[in-house]
Each structure stands twice: as structure tokens, then as C-alpha cells.
Amino acid sequence: MSVVSSVTVTVPATTANLGPGFDCIGAALTLYNKVKFTRLDAGGLIIHVTGKEAEGVNTDESNLLYQAFVKLYQHIEQIPPSVKIEIDLGVPLARGLGSSATAIVGGLVAANQLAGEPLSQLQVMELAIAMEGHPDNVVPALLGGCRLAATSAEGWEICDVPWDENVVPVVAIPDFELSTQEARRVLPTEFSRADAIFNTAHLGLLLRGLATGKGEWLKTALQDKLHQPYRKALIPGYDAVNQAAVAAGAYGMVISGAGPTLLALADAQNSQAVAAAMQTAWQTVGITADVRSLSLDNQGASSLNEG
């Protein structure tokens, strides 16, 4: 077997929860981080980062991408090689778009390639879930598409969620960060039976709405009572952006992951108008946002090896 000297891995951003699917559903989006790992003969660790938020990325052994790389080698009981890591940041940090998942998946996939692919994709996925602590970002980042994850006696059951091509995700990414830890602190530790039933019903409706593209179902399905009512207070202008998105023709708006990015779903004809309305609404409260009409990424993490 020839030794792989370098590998380039491209990993998509992800949006998790989609309203009622708290901690169990996520989708890959056409926004990417690209990382290149190259073996070093001289030893040591070199990390170079490019991109708008490059200064926010650690360039030592605490780097999450590198930690994931080392984790796989520890799992297969091998010593990780010395590497140079080049990171091209396209996914904003701490915005609710799965930046940590791109690092975990990117590091694991790169390590698996440099090690000669000792692990299956399923095994890589299980390692990624263990590192992240929940499946809703790392699974679609690795596999692509929209994915629903549930625990089973054997581990995880992963289900592909059909997504009608006319349902367009519009993301509004503000110029401020919100940590997942902070967003989780505001959540209650217990929920009422009524709220649990509400979310169960709305998640079922969401799955059918995404599969069929039926707007009336999606307008109802995107509601949630388990996390968004508590988290929206952490996002200035949330109500104004929501009202603007719906007025422009969106089916509804949700918090992407832990936030602060806001995600609207719209049909293809309305997506650009929805994007413009969300951007304007945030501007009225003094917040600059990068608003994009995206698509679902159906490939997930991809790698290119060099001998």
C-alpha cells in the first residue's frame, strides 16, 4: 500500500434542530471549510489558517481539528505523524453553523486517510459523535444531506430525511458570536408533557413538509417549545427578523443550531426576497449580517489524497 503524503478534506457547514428537531436532526449546507494535512519529516506541528476569522483559530495542539486527528490515531493505537495543517475557513465560528463539527469531521477523515483507511465511515461517524457529544451536526457534516439520529441498543440509527429541492435554506449570519455553552445554560432542565407532545407532533410534520415541499405544513412545522423560546432572548432583533422573513414569503424561521445564525426556509421563487428582508431587519437594530440563500449539500465530507 502506497503511503499518502497529504490529504485535503472539504467539510460542509451544518444547521441543526430545524425548530422542533432539538438535538436529533441536522442538514449539511453549501458552505465549506477546507483543510489540508501534509506529513512532516522534521517533526512538530505547523498550523496555518486563512479566512475572515482566522485569528479566532488556535494554532497549537489545542486546535480541535488536530485533536480529532490525534483521537483517531489513539483509537487505532498508532502514533500520529507530525503534520502541517492548512485551514481555509469558510464556515463562521460560533455562529450555529457547525464550525466545531467541521473541525471534528475534518480531522477524523484526514487521519483515516493518512492512516490507510483502517476505519469504516460508520466507525468514523461514531468517533465524531463521541467527540461532539451529540449527532445533529457531525452526522450531516460527514454524510451530507439532512439526517435524523436516534439512539439504539447497538449505538445510533441514522435516517436520511428527504428534502424537496424547492425548499431553500436562507441563512442570516450576524457579526456577533454565541457559544453553545451559553445557549444551553438558558434552557430549563425539565419540560412539560404538553411541550414534549407539541414538539413530537411538529417534528413529524416537519419531516413530511421537507419531503413534499408543502408550504402549509412547513409553516406550522417550524414551531418549537423546547429551546427557541428560551434562546431567542440571546439574539437581538430576533422577532424583527422573523417577522420580516415571513412577510417576505418565508415558510418560517428558526435558530440555526445554538445560534445566533437565523435560518429561514422559503421556496425558490421567494428565497432572494427573504434574504434581503432578513438583512434589512437586522440592520434596523444595528446588526450587520451576512445573508445567503444556500442549498442542501448532499455529499458531505470529501477527501483528495496525494501520494
Curated annotation (Swiss-Prot):
Organism superkingdom: Bacteria
Binding annotation for ATP: P92, L93, A94, R95, G96, L97, G98, S99, S100, A101, T102
Lipid biosynthesis is among the record's keywords: no
Keywords recorded for this protein, A-Z: Amino-acid biosynthesis, ATP-binding, Cytoplasm, Kinase, Nucleotide-binding, Threonine biosynthesis, Transferase
Pathway: Amino-acid biosynthesis; L-threonine biosynthesis; L-threonine from L-aspartate: step 4/5
E.C. numbers: 2.7.1.39
Reactions catalysed: L-homoserine + ATP = O-phospho-L-homoserine + ADP + H(+)
Subcellular location: Cytoplasm
The UniProt record lists the keyword Phosphoprotein: no
GO MF annotation: an example: ATP binding
GO biological process assignments: threonine biosynthetic process
SUPFAM superfamilies (UniProt xref): GHMP Kinase, C-terminal domain, Ribosomal protein S5 domain 2-like
Enzymatic class: transferase
Role: Catalyzes the ATP-dependent phosphorylation of L-homoserine to L-homoserine phosphate.
Family, per entry: Belongs to the GHMP kinase family. Homoserine kinase subfamily.
Protein name per Swiss-Prot or TrEMBL: Homoserine kinase
Species, as recorded: Microchaete diplosiphon
Upper taxonomic lineage: Bacteria, Bacillati, Cyanobacteriota, Cyanophyceae, Nostocales
